UniProtKB/Swiss-Prot annotation:
<comment type="function">
    <text>Cleaves peptides in various proteins in a process that requires ATP hydrolysis. Has a chymotrypsin-like activity. Plays a major role in the degradation of misfolded proteins.</text>
</comment>
<keyword id="KW-0963">Cytoplasm</keyword>
<dbReference type="InterPro" id="IPR023562">
    <property type="entry name" value="ClpP/TepA"/>
</dbReference>
<dbReference type="GO" id="GO:0051117">
    <property type="term" value="F:ATPase binding"/>
</dbReference>
<dbReference type="Pfam" id="PF00574">
    <property type="entry name" value="CLP_protease"/>
</dbReference>
<comment type="similarity">
    <text>Belongs to the peptidase S14 family.</text>
</comment>
<protein>
    <recommendedName>
        <fullName>ATP-dependent Clp protease proteolytic subunit</fullName>
        <ecNumber>3.4.21.92</ecNumber>
    </recommendedName>
</protein>
<dbReference type="InterPro" id="IPR018215">
    <property type="entry name" value="ClpP_Ser_AS"/>
</dbReference>
<dbReference type="InterPro" id="IPR001907">
    <property type="entry name" value="ClpP"/>
</dbReference>
<comment type="subunit">
    <text>Fourteen ClpP subunits assemble into 2 heptameric rings which stack back to back to give a disk-like structure with a central cavity, resembling the structure of eukaryotic proteasomes.</text>
</comment>
<dbReference type="InterPro" id="IPR029045">
    <property type="entry name" value="ClpP/crotonase-like_dom_sf"/>
</dbReference>
<feature type="active site">
    <location>
        <position position="136"/>
    </location>
</feature>
<keyword id="KW-0378">Hydrolase</keyword>
<dbReference type="GO" id="GO:0009368">
    <property type="term" value="C:endopeptidase Clp complex"/>
</dbReference>
<dbReference type="GO" id="GO:0006515">
    <property type="term" value="P:protein quality control for misfolded or incompletely synthesized proteins"/>
</dbReference>
<keyword id="KW-0645">Protease</keyword>
<dbReference type="GO" id="GO:0004176">
    <property type="term" value="F:ATP-dependent peptidase activity"/>
</dbReference>
Length: 207
């Protein structure tokens, strides 16, 4: 039992968000680190892509557009992917807002994370040198009666075709190659992702 408390503390500490304190002539003001970076127009998408993640990212994109519709927004991605519908909410908002949305992969951009990475403004898609990118087709787990499984299968096939066409548009690859290359998990280095058209630059230092 004596070792349980340190482990609990470590688990809680991993969820802590650092606080930044800024001092000016008007006194001190504190921000959580993500709010402070939001002031610099940096949005983080970290972890699974789900409805909660999508709501937060979409809200931040819309807020930053209202603040300045002419200044770029940076979306930093470290995600294994997740829900297609949640990812498409982010994707559509990225295309909808007036500012260019620059994307940067740090760590991993897989599945829907890779799709959103490739969906950034042309010429403004980046990855760090040791980042990994993975593309594949949508996953499905159809259950229920035969008619229900048929409906779900049609929807998955539609989503696969839609995602393939969008990925072809953003990478410059033809749809047939995208379909072949996403048939199974397809991992790439940053340089491979650049050659494929998923990103435009491999960043080793901030410009």
């Amino acid at each position: 039992m004596a070792s349980q408390a340190p482990r609990d503390f470590e688990a809680q500490a991993l969820g802590l968000v650092p606080i930044v304190v800024e001092t000016s002539g008007r006194g001190e003001r504190s921000y959580d680190i993500y709010s402070r970076l939001l002031k610099e127009r940096i949005v983080f998408m970290v972890g699974e892509v789900n409805d909660q993640t999508a709501n937060l990212v979409v809200a931040q994109l819309l807020f930053l557009e209202s603040e300045n519709p002419d200044k770029d927004i940076s979306l930093y991605i470290n995600s294994p992917g997740g829900s297609v519908s949640a990812g498409m909410a982010i994707y559509d908002t990225m295309q909808f807002v007036k500012p260019d949305v620059s994307t940067l992969c740090m760590g991993l951009a897989a599945s829907m994370g890779a799709f959103l990475l490739a969906s950034g403004a042309k010429g403004k898609r980046y990855a760090l040198p040791n980042a990994r990118v993975m593309i594949h087709q949508p996953l499905g787990g159809a259950r229920g009666q035969a008619s229900d499984i048929e409906i779900q299968a049609r929807e998955i096939l539609y989503l696969r075709d839609r995602l393939n066409h969008l990925l072809a548009h953003h990478t410059g690859q033809d749809v047939e190659r995208i379909a072949r290359d996403t048939d199974r998990d397809n991992f790439m280095s940053s340089e491979d992702a650049k050659a494929y058209g998923l990103i435009d630059h491999v960043s080793t230092k901030r410009p």
